[in-house]
């Protein structure tokens, strides 16, 4: 009797074995179903990371573009500043030359007047006249190097841009609008008239 009590019935053993197998199968199934889920979660994390990195890359590229634009604008500003500075220097230089020429013209006029009114027949005055003529020539040669040119339009056609008509006179065998006399020479500085020549102009005969 005692041995029969200790012996586990075969049916019970089989039942317990079935339960164990079912549990093991369920564990395997749960493990297999969890693996794709974990892989999916890992894949989603990778995609999120890639998206974040792409956004950071796009932001960095935009910052580079903006910085390049800033550099280009800065370079353009420097070029413009240099150009404006050069123009200002050039204008100041021209203005200084104009002021210098304006102050010098009366001196030239006085020397020319002294020569034209001098008695060239007087032998005692010849050395002085020659000295004044040399001084005038030297002065004109010097100012010519700085762009100051004489306007002396005798026998030329009247040009209202460079000449100022003081009077008109009919002269035989001379076509109208010709400069027949120059009362005062004019001057231009680097192509710009700073004083027109005062002239007498021919007109048609009545």
Curated annotation (Swiss-Prot):
It is found in: Cytoplasm. The keyword Transcription does not apply. It comes from the Bacteria. The keyword Chaperone applies. GO terms for cellular component: cytosol. GO terms for molecular function: adenyl-nucleotide exchange factor activity; protein homodimerization activity; protein-folding chaperone binding; unfolded protein binding. One of its GO terms (biological process) is protein folding. Gene3D superfamilies: 3.90.20.20, Head domain of nucleotide exchange factor GrpE (2.30.22.10). Keywords: Chaperone, Cytoplasm, Stress response. InterPro entries: GrpE, GrpE_coiled_coil, GrpE_head. Participates actively in the response to hyperosmotic and heat shock by preventing the aggregation of stress-denatured proteins, in association with DnaK and GrpE. It is the nucleotide exchange factor for DnaK and may function as a thermosensor. Unfolded proteins bind initially to DnaJ; upon interaction with the DnaJ-bound protein, DnaK hydrolyzes its bound ATP, resulting in the formation of a stable complex. GrpE releases ADP from DnaK; ATP binding to DnaK triggers the release of the substrate protein, thus completing the reaction cycle. Homodimer. Belongs to the GrpE family. NCBIfam families: PRK14150.1. This is Protein GrpE. The lineage of its organism: Bacteria, Pseudomonadati, Pseudomonadota, Gammaproteobacteria, Alteromonadales.
